[in-house]
């Protein structure tokens, strides 16, 4: 049961956080969004582009976690598999966020260079 619950909560959280970023509803701030370099605060265009890309990554991560939650639901009575689902969920979340941070960091520098900020 724990694998299902954790996967589902993290999947829904990732999806909801990503949706707001994709639709560019989050204004530049220091609390919510991909603040990967100083350049995201120097231009609203860079902020929205980087956060839209990061939001897409969160949607993809959330979709993968939703699949894991579905599998965990099928095996809800197997405690060993539930533990494995928790591990897989946390591993995918961590790796996905690390990759997303690397990609959005590079994107912020590319956009800053294009705008003459770098």
State what each model feature region is:
Residues 2-19, 86-97:
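Alpha-helical transmembrane segments
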Residues 16-34, 102-110:
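Membrane-water interface of transmembrane alpha-helices
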């Amino acid at each position: 049961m724990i694998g299902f619950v954790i996967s589902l909560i993290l999947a829904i959280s990732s999806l909801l956080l990503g949706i707001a970023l994709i639709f560019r509803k989050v204004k530049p701030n220091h609390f919510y969004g991909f603040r990967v370099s100083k350049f995201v605060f120097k231009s609203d265009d860079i902020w929205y582009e980087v956060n839209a890309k990061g939001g897409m990554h969160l949607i993809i991560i959330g979709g993968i976690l939703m699949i894991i939650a579905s599998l965990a639901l099928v095996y809800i009575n197997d405690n060993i598999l539930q533990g494995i689902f928790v591990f897989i969920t946390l591993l995918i979340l961590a790796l996905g966020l690390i990759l997303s941070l690397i990609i959005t960091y590079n994107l912020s520098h590319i956009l800053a260079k294009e705008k003459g900020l770098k």
